[in-house]
Amino acid sequence: MLLLPLLPVLLCVVSVSSSGSQTCEDTLKTCSVIACGRDGRDGPKGEKGEPGQGLRGLQGPPGKLGPPGSVGSPGSPGPKGQKGDHGDNRAIEEKLANMEAEIRILKSKLQLTNKLHAFSMGKKSGKKLFVTNHEKMPFSKVKSLCTELQGTVAIPRNAEENKAIQEVATGIAFLGITDEATEGQFMYVTGGRLTYSNWKKDEPNNHGSGEDCVIILDNGLWNDISCQASFKAVCEFPA
């Protein structure tokens, strides 16, 4: 009878005790599940912090150069400059004059060389060299040709030189002897009277007058002849 009034109190204690035990078990089970689960997602971004209070660090090394840029378009032309003063042409004109003079000398030497090449091999006698190109021409042209070649018309001053001229000419040729200044008085074209002669018999005879020049025949003898006639040119040079 005494226990009956206490029955509700006992039921409450058992109920609380049983509920507390279940809660602990649930708590253990819950903690076990959390420990075994994966990481959760990141939370929302926090607010920007305040600037730091430390010293500023050193500047870093420069970076690599970038690629060159594209070539720009040409700029607009600048203004035209003022007209300059006339140059001094005197020095240029002097140089041109000198060059022209040198060219004339070279041409003259070339012409001389070409004419010398036209002559056959000569014949040396003592200190003289006699040469011919075997061309026939009047005495005036023979004299001009030999002078242009810096020689003279062949003059035999002894029998040896006369023989050399005869062999070189291989035909009739003019000698550097005339009586143009005084008839009958034959002189060398270089000046002076004859010191040697080899006239053909009855020569010189001034046949028909006007035979003021001298030729050497095939046999080496001399004959007076008109200076307008044409015979071979033989020139002499110092050897």
UniProtKB/Swiss-Prot annotation:
| Residues with PTM 4-hydroxyproline | 44, 51, 62, 68, 74, 79
Domain C-type lectin, first and last residues per copy: 144-239
Q: Which residues form the Collagen-like domain?
A: 37-89
Residue ranges, compositional bias (Basic and acidic residues)? 38-50
What subcellular locations does the record give? Secreted
**Cysteine disulfide partners in this protein:** 146-235, 213-227
Composition-biased stretches (Low complexity): 58-74
**Modified how:** Hydroxylated on lysine and proline residues within the collagen-like domain.
Protein name listed in UniProt: Mannose-binding protein A
